[in-house]
Amino acid sequence: MSYPTDPEFASVEITSRHSNLRTETRSGRTQVRSLGAQRRAIKGRYNDLKRSEFAPVFAFVMAQKGGVEEFTIVPPVVSSSSGGAVGTMRTNGSHTAGDSTITVDGFSGLIKAGDFVKFGNHDKVYMVTADQSGAGTLNIQPGLVEAVANNEVITYNSVPFTVRLENDIQEWSLSGFDRYNFEIDLIEVL
């Protein structure tokens, strides 16, 4: 199931959450240990929607039963490559879970640092951490959460994030005459 694309959000906020343990000694020395998990939170805001625009969005949200159901969302603007890449990007060789350098081919143009990508065999979305022009090594973070096989398709335009509602309580406000304001908080499903 896909989140409605119309109307578009007035604003989108994407947050990266890493699972780390952090301790600080009395002398001020800090130790940090990564638990290896990373996921994104997405906050979308709508301002001044007419009832005819708002009703289908809120009906979709209600159908998710709070945080029970999973669905996909393609955030506007940031879900597509900013470097003008074309073609079908694929893995060139297999890669194991934890790898953050992925050999790729099958496309031309540029994938830029900050672009999002998704591998065809699982739902996790990754961020590119260094520009890559055509075949070569794609640097991503976090490291792969699942192994990928040779020739696995990598989506870099209209990247779908698999999410659920972060909160079980959803509320909206009505301002002026028939103008709805609504904010939705989503969390990436791992």
State the predicted function of each range.
Residues 1-190:
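Extracellular/virion structural assembly segments
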